[in-house]
Every structure is written in structure tokens, then in C-alpha cells.
Amino acid sequence: MKGRILILSLLIMSLVMAQVQVEAKICCPSNQARNGYSVCRIRFSKGRCMQVSGCQNSDTCPRGWVNAILENSADATNEHCKLGCETSVCGAMNTLQNSDASEIVNGASEQCAKGCSIFCTKSYVVPPGPPKLL
């Protein structure tokens, strides 16, 4: 039974992480342009690097521009959480929980909510017990 909960938890976390990929992409016309953009971003602004590399900021890349870079945007992540990670990711599970109050479904639903909380707050889970001294 614990194995099922673990598998469901991993599935839920992968669904949560997949939600991040709805944000804008930096689309580049070639590998060379993408690499140039990535190196440029170490020191310069996004706008400057797009201008120099020929890349574009877009939700969808133009045909043939398959070299997309997903931007890690805290605003997009926070917005997703504000809109309701639990509603969008755990909604089907909550419906199942309402129709079948089994222990596995209840546990998976709790894990989903916990995963959303950790994801949205960028927290980590502290293991139980006293801290170990190095």
C-alpha cells in the first residue's frame, strides 16, 4: 500500500512540475544562437541578449525554431499557485476522493496538497528527528 502512495506521489509531483512549462519561452533560430543567448544571460539583460543573439520571447516558437529555452520565472510560478495548484493538479483526485473514500485515495490527495504547498512556497521537507552534527 505504501508503494502505491509513493507512486501516486511521484505522479502528482511530475504533474505539478509539468505545470511550470506553461510560461513563456525564449525561441532561438539555431543552436549557435541559443548558446550565445545562454552565455550572454550570465552578465546581461534578457532584452540585450535577445537583440544580440536573434532570439525571441514568445509563448510559441516560429516554425523551424525548435531551440526553445524555458525561462525560470518566479512570477509565473507564483501566479500558478495563486490560481490554485490544488484545483488544477489535484482536482481529479479530489473528485475521486469524494466518490470513493478509500485510504489510498485519501493519502494520495493529501500528498498532492502537500506537494503543491512545497512547490508553491519553494520549501523543503525537514526529516523527523534531531539534526545531525557534522
UniProtKB/Swiss-Prot annotation:
The keyword Secreted applies. It comes from Arabidopsis thaliana. Its main location: secreted. Residues 1-24 form the signal peptide. One of its GO terms (molecular function) is toxin activity. Belongs to the plant thionin (TC 1.C.44) family. Keywords: Disulfide bond, Plant defense, Secreted, Signal, Toxin. It holds the Pfam family Thionin. It is found in: Secreted. Residues 68-134 form a propeptide. Disulfide bonds join C27-C61, C28-C55, C40-C49. This is Thionin-2.1.
